[in-house]
Amino acid sequence: MQISDEEFLQLRDFIYQQCGIFIAENRKYLVENRLSNRIKELNLKSYSDYYNFLRFDGSRRTELTKLFEVVTTNETSFFRNPPQLEVFQKSVLPDILDQCRKAGRKKLRIWSAGCSTGEEPYTLAIILCEVLKSELSSWDIKITANDLSEAVLAAARRGVYNDYAL
């Protein structure tokens, strides 16, 4: 089943309004491919029917969760993007820690948005352990990680990874 330009724009804008994910027009094929199975499973006839289902059906909340699952890309790994992590570890984090120490508040909050299966927030925890070493136990540190996908969050909570992920 092929998605029309109008259907794509309708769904793209709806997805953006619901979860903040913007899908460029050159990625229309992704929407078509990823949503075609949902449309079949719901016995709908078109992408317009799916859009209306998402907006008006009584079970739309459940379907929104499934929509978020299929439109998100869960690219993740431990120590992903080394140059960025190096700047965080050697420049950003030490500056923040020094400011906290000077203020007499050894409290740190980090938010990992779009954490997928958890490799990024666990990487941040490892970096904190390496930077703070023996001082770690005197700090109040919380890393909050979230994602639109409940399935990947469940994997992140388990914190069990295979050799390939490591």
Q: What residue spans do the PLM features occupy?
A:
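Conserved AdoMet
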Residues: 1-111
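Alpha-helical elements of the RecA-like P-loop NTPase motor core of helicases
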Residues: 86, 122, 154
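Active-site catalytic pocket residues across diverse enzymes, especially alpha/beta-hydrolases
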Residues: 92, 96, 128-132, 160
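Aromatic-flanked redox-active Cys/Sec active sites in thiol-based oxidoreductases
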Residues: 111-117
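Extended basic-aromatic, gly/pro-enriched interface segments that bind polyanionic ligands
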Residues: 113, 134-166
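Conserved SAM-binding loop of SAM-dependent methyltransferases across substrates and taxa
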Residues: 117-136
